[in-house]
UniProtKB/Swiss-Prot annotation:
EC number(s) given by UniProt: 2.8.1.8
Annotated pathway: Protein modification; protein lipoylation via endogenous pathway; protein N(6)-(lipoyl)lysine from octanoyl-[acyl-carrier-protein]: step 2/2
GO CC terms of this entry: cytoplasm
Lineage: Bacteria, Bacillati, Actinomycetota, Actinomycetes, Mycobacteriales
The protein's enzyme class: transferase
Disulfide bonds listed in the record: none
UniProt keyword terms in alphabetical order: 4Fe-4S, Cytoplasm, Iron, Iron-sulfur, Metal-binding, S-adenosyl-L-methionine, Transferase
The name this protein goes by in its record: Lipoyl synthase
Binding residues annotated for [4Fe-4S] cluster 1, in chain numbering: C71, C76, C82, S308
Pfam family, one: LIAS_N
Length: 352
C-alpha cells in the first residue's frame, strides 16, 4: 500500500468574482459572497490517502473504460477508502441544475435534454467496477414534466437488473413532494432512499431558496411510509448553532429518518456561501452521541464525512436496528470496515 497526505487547498487572499462555468452573470448573492476571501482550513481538514489494491484496480479500470463517477470528478477526499471497499457514487440528469443552493458546486442553468440511455450506462459502469454498493444522486429537473422521476427510478431498476448483489442508495431532490413523482421513485425500491435536509430552519430559505424545510421532511416521511430505509444529511458551518442542529435532528427523526450523516461545509468557490466557522472534531463526536440518543438507526459524523460515506455499512446498521434481514446477496455489507473520517477517529489523529 502507498500512503500520502492529501491536504485540501488553503486560501486566505481575496479572489476576483468569477463568472460561472456556463458563462452566466453572477447573481447578486454570488457577488456578495465573493467579497469574502476563501477561508484557511484547519489542520483536521486533511485526509490520509491509503492506496490499497482494490482502489488501484478500480482506478485503472475507470481510466481504461472511460467511466465517470462523482468520486473522481468532484475530487472527493474519501475516494481511496470508499473505492477500496468497492463503493462509488454517480451523478445523473446532466451537469445543470434547475435550482441553486448556496453551498453546492453544481451550476444552475437550463439542463440538456433528458438522456434516456443514461440508466443503462450507469448500470454497466456499476457492473464493470464490480461495486458492492452504489449511490446515485442527481440534479433537480424542474424542466421535465415528471421532475426527472422516471430517470431516478429507471437508473435504480437498471442497476438492479444487471447487478442483483449490489446495494443501491438513491439520493433525490424533493420533486416538490408530488405524490405521483415520489411514488414512481419509491417503486424502484432502492436499499436506501435519501433526501438531504442540509441545514436548520432559521437559515434554510437563505441557503436553499428553492426548497422548503417542512417539504423536505415530508419527503422522508413519505419514503418511510412506503417501507423504505430513509437517510438525510446536515451540513455544519453555515451559520447554525449547536442547539439548532439538535432540533433539526429531532425533526428528522420524528419525520421518519433512519440514517443521519453530519459534515462540515467546505466552500466550493468564492461565489458560494462563506464558511461561518470550522466545527471541531469533538463537536462532531457530541452531535453523533446526541443523534444516537435521539434514536437514529445509523449515524456518521465528521468534518469530511459526506452523505455517501460508508453508505453500505450504515444501511446494514439500519437494517439490524429494525430487526430486518439483509438480502443474502448483500450480506457482505454487514462486514466491518474502516471509517477514518468518523469524528472520533479524526479526534484521535489531530486532537482538539
Amino acid at each position: 500500500m502507498t500512503s500520502v497526505d492529501t491536504p485540501t487547498p488553503h486560501g486566505g487572499t481575496p479572489a476576483p468574482a468569477p463568472a460561472t462555468a456556463n458563462g452566466r452573470k453572477l447573481l447578486r448573492i454570488e457577488a456578495r459572497n465573493a467579497q469574502t476571501p476563501i477561508e484557511r482550513k484547519p489542520k483536521w481538514i486533511r485526509t490520509r490517502a491509503t492506496m490499497g489494491p482494490e482502489y488501484s484496480e478500480l482506478k485503472g479500470l475507470v481510466k481504461r473504460e472511460g467511466l465517470h463517477t462523482v468520486c473522481e470528478e468532484a475530487g472527493c477526499p474519501n475516494i481511496f477508502e470508499c473505492w477500496e471497499d468497492r463503493e462509488a457514487t454517480f451523478l445523473i440528469g446532466g451537469e445543470q441544475c434547475t435550482r441553486r443552493c448556496d453551498f453546492c458546486q453544481i451550476d444552475t442553468g437550463k439542463p440538456a435534454a433528458l438522456d434516456r440511455d443514461e440508466p443503462r450506462r450507469v448500470a454497466e459502469s456499476v457492473q464493470a467496477m464490480g461495486l458492492r454498493y452504489s449511490t446515485i444522486t442527481g440534479v433537480a429537473r424542474d424542466d421535465l414534466e415528471d421532475g426527472g422521476a422516471w430517470l431516478y427510478a429507471e437508473t435504480v431498476r437498471a442497476i438492479k437488473r444487471l447487478n442483483p448483489a449490489t446495494g443501491v442508495e438513491l439520493l433525490i431532490p424533493d420533486f416538490n413532494a408530488d405524490p405521483d413523482q415520489l411514488a414512481e421513485v419509491f417503486s424502484a425500491r432502492p436499499e436506501v432512499l435519501a433526501h438531504n435536509l442540509e441545514t436548520v430552519p432559521r437559515i434554510f430559505k437563505r441557503i436553499r431558496p428553492a426548497f422548503r424545510y417542512e417539504r423536505s421532511l415530508s419527503v422522508l416521511t413519505a419514503a418511510r411510509e412506503a417501507g423504505l430505509v430513509t437517510k438525510s444529511n446536515l451540513i455544519l458551518g453555515m451559520g447554525e448553532t449547536p442547539e439548532e442542529v439538535t432540533e433539526a435532528m429531532r425533526d428528522l427523526h420524528e419525520a421518519g429518518c433512519d440514517i443521519l450523516t453530519i459534515t462540515q461545509y467546505l466552500r466550493p468557490s468564492p461565489r458560494h456561501h462563506p464558511v461561518d466557522r470550522w466545527v471541531k472534531p469533538e463537536e462532531f463526536v457530541e452531535h453523533s452521541r446526541v443523534a444516537e440518543e435521539i434514536g437514529f438507526a445509523g449515524v456518521m459524523a465528521g468534518p469530511l464525512v459526506r452523505s455517501s460515506y460508508r453508505a453500505g455499512r450504515l444501511y446494514a446498521q439500519a437494517m439490524a436496528h429494525h430487526g430486518r434481514e439483509i438480502p443474502p446477496a448483500m450480506a457482505h455489507l454487514a462486514e466491518e470496515g474502516t471509517a477514518s473520517q468518523e469524528a472520533s477517529a479524526v479526534l484521535a489523529r489531530f486532537g482538539s
